[in-house]
Amino acid sequence: GNEIPECGNKLDVQMGKKIADKIRSLDDTRYVTNSVNFVLSIQDRMGEIMAGMAAENTQEVQKKEEASGAEQQEINSMMTDFAAFMDRIVAGETAGKATEEAFGQVDIAGYNYAACRYESDREKYPDRIIVGSETTPQSLDMNWPLVEKYSNVIGDFSWTAWDYLGEAGIGKITYGEKKGMEFYAPYPYKAA
């Protein structure tokens, strides 16, 4: 799977195991992967996590949003603005615990925007094979040395944010008053 937010949920982790087992029963020659956005896997605890973060960082982002006058941002702007926050959230113990069981069911753990975990997870999960399944283009020069350094990290793939088939909602264009981030649009915006 890719960015399945429920991978941090006990019931859905059980379903993930059933799916992985079924895939292996059909073809045991291929690797089973799950590419996880750690932030999505703990989104139900985000308020609690954000409350624990340093107040000045939260205020800095709020000031930036107020200065731009934007109520909601485009996905690419949001990803850039929150890069520092995301690393802190992703590197946290809550994110690690939430994904531990889901990654234990697959052959290769896909880390979306989580290069900050490569070193610590190599120590904590020495048998885990990791791939940078989605990373930002501006991070490639920092991520590739990590791929070369850690033998359990087998590669790095950059998400280019270019329109392609497969990302639900990104083909939607809005006009008038409803401008802004409406990334998760309902049907018929299921494919770009």
Please identify what each model-predicted range represents.
Residues 1-192:
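Extended substrate-binding grooves/exosites of carbohydrate-active enzymes
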